[in-house]
Each structure stands twice: as C-alpha cells, then as structure tokens.
Amino acid sequence: MHLLVPFASDASEACRHVLRDLALPNLARVLALLSPADRDEGEPSSFTPPHERALAAAWHWQGGDGRWPWAARAAANDTIAVGDRAWALVTPAHWQLGRDHVLMTDPAHLSLTDTESSALFEAVRGLFESEGFKAAFGSASRWYIARDDLEGLRTASLDRVIGRGVDSWLGNEASAIGRLVRRLQSEVQLVLHTHPINEERE
C-alpha cells in the first residue's frame, strides 16, 4: 500500500514554523505503521507541488514541472473528448489587488453556480475561439481551452498559486503562446469585470 499525503510538508520557512508546534496524533499513528519510500520536498518555487509530481511519476507521464497533462485529465473526467490536443485549465477566480502585488484568492470562495459560471464562460468563449482555441465548459470552477501549441506552455498548479502573488507564476511571456495567453487573460478580465453577473455579485 502507498499513502500519499498532500501538503504534509513544504520547504518554505512559513511551513516549517507551523509544523514545529503542530500536533497531528492521528497522522503520526498512521505514519508509524508505514515505511517511507521516497521523499520529495521540492522547491516552493516549482510550478508543481510534490504530491502532483508523485502522481505524474506513478502514471509515467512525460513533461516535467508545469508541463504535465493535468488539464487534459480533468477535462476527460468532465466528459470532454480531449483527443490528442494540449489542454489548459481556465479557472474563474478573484484576483485581489494590493499596492505591489496581485493575489489570487481561492476559486472556491466565489461559490459560482453552474448557471452563473456557464453564462460567464459563454461571455468569453469567443475570445478564445477567435484565436484558434477549442473552448469547453467543464463545471462551475473548471473551463478548458485546447490548442496544439499549449503543449510547451509551462503553467503552475492552482495549489501553488492560491493565496500567493500571481506574478511569479505567470511565466512563458517570451513565447508566442505565452504572450497570447497573457493577452487573452487581460481581455477576459475586462469582459468579466463589467458582466452583469459579476456586478450583481458585488
């Protein structure tokens, strides 16, 4: 039996500080019954957290940090025919603006209904399709886009970005697809900012 414990450790100073005084007796009892196999601390700046890297290795995925097919897998689970195209996850989320940073809050806090999210998705679908993307609605919190050149785009796991500044996770601006995605991201923000559903929720 293998047990994978997501978020059980982090190389960051903040995590080490919390773990010093954190009592987890039930987890300690379970871990005492097991022998550690591999340990992957990773770097806090890697685009993929350790538990996702472990799963990617177990499934023999090719790619590397920030380039594993998580979006295609999620889309397939949402009954979208993914074929052999490269997919990206588009997640409705609130970005909190600070004086010198932009923080992404947990998308779950939006509590979008499927009806609300579907209407927002339809409002921006054309932006993606006009640039050659296939766009698909998965659920209230999962929209998808597909285009062959997304395969080379390095993207961060939501688990890395939530609660943190987004700037360090928005890599690949130098590539053509990276610049296109950043431009579309800005255009989507403009459309959604003034959308009636967004205004009703404020």
Report residues per predicted region.
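N-terminal basic/disordered segments at the start of proteins
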Residues: 1-18
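An N-terminal, globular interaction/scaffold subdomain
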Residues: 16-118, 123
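Glycine-rich, often proline-containing surface loops adjacent to acidic residues and nearby aromatics
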Residues: 96-108, 142-144, 162-169
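Extended, Lys/Arg-enriched charged tracts that mediate electrostatic binding to polyanionic substrates
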Residues: 109-137, 196-201
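Hydrophobic, well-ordered secondary-structure segments
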Residues: 117, 121, 125, 142, ...
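Short, glycine/charge-rich beta-strand/loop segments that flank catalytic centers
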Residues: 134-147
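Loop-centered beta-sheet repeat module
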Residues: 150-201
